[in-house]
UniProtKB/Swiss-Prot annotation:
GO terms for cellular component: cytoplasm; Holliday junction resolvase complex. Belongs to the RuvC family. Mg(2+) 2 binds at E67. Its cofactor is Mg(2+). It is found in: Cytoplasm. Its main location: cytoplasm. The active site is at D8, E67, D139. Coiled coil: none annotated. The RuvA-RuvB-RuvC complex processes Holliday junction (HJ) DNA during genetic recombination and DNA repair. Endonuclease that resolves HJ intermediates. Cleaves cruciform DNA by making single-stranded nicks across the HJ at symmetrical positions within the homologous arms, yielding a 5'-phosphate and a 3'-hydroxyl group; requires a central core of homology in the junction. The consensus cleavage sequence is 5'-(A/T)TT(C/G)-3'. Cleavage occurs on the 3'-side of the TT dinucleotide at the point of strand exchange. It catalyses: Endonucleolytic cleavage at a junction such as a reciprocal single-stranded crossover between two homologous DNA duplexes (Holliday junction). Pfam families: RuvC. One of its GO terms (biological process) is DNA recombination. This is Crossover junction endodeoxyribonuclease RuvC. The gene is ruvC.
């Protein structure tokens, strides 16, 4: 059994989703958005850090999964997104959580089956996979999709990591 916190970072709205994985079964534990209404970026980053820290304290996840930065046409937006990611990652690292990153295309491919899926398709599949009564908010759905992706891909990541570790020690299995 493992609890996974997924984060969809944003400088104004950061989505979060928490699920429990027991074998192949996924259980919804909670989701929502950290909304920053203040105008200056440092204050928004502080709110993101505090919000993610509070969520970690509340749910006690074992794993932290976050969306990777993508290349944006607007450099200023990309920088702000990177800073929001940094605030969330520092909150996780401060509580000794391992951090995993997934590209948006990889998340959509894993959850919907199409790397170019629309937000509404992600929301629908998250609702279906977690047996929710309604579609979650878009940012929360993205965060839940990131957590689901971690569940599906983490076994491969672990196996690859162990294989590299064993090879580095000169042992083969």
């Amino acid at each position: 059994m493992a609890i996974i916190l997924g984060i969809d970072p944003g400088s104004r709205i950061t989505g979060y989703g928490v699920i429990r994985q027991t074998g192949r079964q996924l259980t919804y534990l909670g989701s929502g958005c950290i909304r920053t209404s203040v105008t200056d970026l440092p204050s928004r980053l502080k709110l993101i850090y505090a919000g993610v820290s509070e969520i970690i304290t509340q749910f006690q996840p074992e794993y932290f999964a976050i969306e990777q930065v993508f290349m944006a046409k607007n450099a200023d937006s990309a920088l702000k997104l990177g800073q929001a990611r940094g605030a969330a990652i520092v909150a996780a690292v401060n509580q000794d959580l391992p951090v995993f990153e997934y590209a948006a295309r990889q998340v959509k491919q894993t959850v919907v089956g199409i790397g170019s899926a629309e937000k509404s398709q992600v929301q629908h599949m998250v609702r279906t996979l977690l047996k929710l009564p309604a579609n979650p908010q878009a940012d929360a759905a993205d965060a839940l999709a990131i957590a689901i992706t971690h569940c599906h891909l983490s076994q491969n990541v672990t196996r690859l990591g162990e294989g590299n570790l064993n090879l580095a020690r000169g042992r083969l299995r």
